[in-house]
Amino acid sequence: MREKLKLYYLCRFTQLSPLRLSGGKNDRTDNDLMLDSRGLPMIPGSALAGVLRSRLTREDADLLFGKNTVGNDMTESAVLVGDAALPAGAKVRFTHRDGVGLDERKIAIPKAKYDFETAECSVPYTAVIEWSGWSDDPALPLLDALLAGAAADGLAFGGRTTRGYGRMAADVCKKAFHFPADVDAWLAFDSDDVNSFADATPVVG
């Protein structure tokens, strides 16, 4: 039977290598990390969505995340991707590293040295991804498969990922609410509280 659904995926990302995700500022280095209001590194939802979208074909990405066009061809995403944040009090090691600009032949450019900031933390970053739609929506199996693949392969965020930066292991679990049967449980659910996912179903690849 066709049902209205709301799905919540709790994603935990554990660093396997230093993170270099620029916030566009250069107060501390030539390329500062993106930090939240608490001064902790974060992965914005737009960056997480972009990494996930890149794992799909264009057709599947448009179906799941909407079309990035204008006018009548634009479609809205059924997926809401939250920021991946560290818990309060997480201990982070910040490091300033040196780099050098390269030309098109990968040869160092004279006087093109720069520095950038990286972060290392053993505590997982946590993000929530929300999906709303009907049980027969063709985008639904795409999202499950996408996040199962992320859990199996891990993801990489930020700059210099081809050099090994930003690699993270992913652990994903899911809470599903069927309407109208689960309306009371959904009203009592708090997606911002990780304890609300205590009985969530693991998403595995």
Predicted regions and their residues:
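Small/polar/charged residue-enriched interaction surfaces, especially the RNA/DNA-contacting tracks
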Residues: 1-205
